[in-house]
Amino acid sequence: MIRELEYYGSPTLRRKAEAILEITDEIRQLAQDMYETMVAHKGVGLAAPQVGESVSLFVMCVEGETEDGDLIFCDFPKVYINPVLSNVSEDLVLGREGCLSIPGLRADVYRPRSITVKAINLDGQEFTEHLEGFPARIVMHENDHLNGILYIDKMEEPKDYKKFKSALEKIRRRYNNHITDKAS
């Protein structure tokens, strides 16, 4: 099922997600719904807070990059439950980022070149991955969502910052009727 997205201005996007203690049918369905929502909106990753669920889970559909920089997409979504990042590279790389919760805007963000992520899959199995390049950027971006952080909090200031801030305010106003606060 495609779920409604939370947009910039939603309190859910600024809340630290809660750890998932048990993988239930509801969690499995949430992951499936998130994947369908991500694909429907042409995303490459999606965190649970972006669909109004403040739990520590995100999905991603990129496995890597070719030498030419083309993305290699997964046959099945990767699900990360209660992710923990480590071995964060000191080498920072500037890259453009966007977000389904901030439609139409992109900005440059410095992120580490590589990371290691340890998480749990839908079968309850712990796994560890070392990621570099764009897949690492996606994991860091989605993991930030689980901590109430948006890419705009880390972006390099755009050349026309006033215009960017104005666009953010338009997003907040436009999607205000979609804002939910499920913790209230």
Curated annotation (Swiss-Prot):
Keywords: Hydrolase, Iron, Metal-binding, Protein biosynthesis. SUPFAM superfamilies: Peptide deformylase (SSF56420). Binds 1 Fe(2+) ion. The active site is at E142. Gene3D superfamilies: Peptide deformylase. It is an enzyme of class 3 (hydrolase). One of its GO terms (molecular function) is metal ion binding. Fe cation binds at C99, H141, H145. CDD domains: Pep_deformylase. It comes from the Bacteria. Its EC number is 3.5.1.88. GO terms for biological process: co-translational protein modification; translation. Coiled coil: none annotated. It holds the Pfam family Pep_deformylase. Removes the formyl group from the N-terminal Met of newly synthesized proteins. Requires at least a dipeptide for an efficient rate of reaction. N-terminal L-methionine is a prerequisite for activity but the enzyme has broad specificity at other positions. Belongs to the polypeptide deformylase family. This is Peptide deformylase. It comes from Chlamydia abortus (strain DSM 27085 / S26/3).
